[in-house]
């Protein structure tokens, strides 16, 4: 999934140049930045249980965005979980973490889709 609050990604992820080229800076093009941060800024409309599985060192979709979304959903009493995999990036390389991800997916599906 993409970053839910792109404002938190500015300067924290690897895409700063692309952001500036495509949508400008947050201070020069605030309206657009708020629009693309829609999921976080409209968290009060989310009712779907949510599972965040994130690498601690993910520079593609930084941890901060998942932490913010998780906290917002917890505050709103939406069922949500945040699992952070230490030392991992966007793609996990530790076999036990990959196994854990699959087990968590299956448990989540069993709980919320059955």
Task: Annotate the PLM regions.
Residues 1-114:
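Active-site-proximal cap/loop segments of hydrolase catalytic domains
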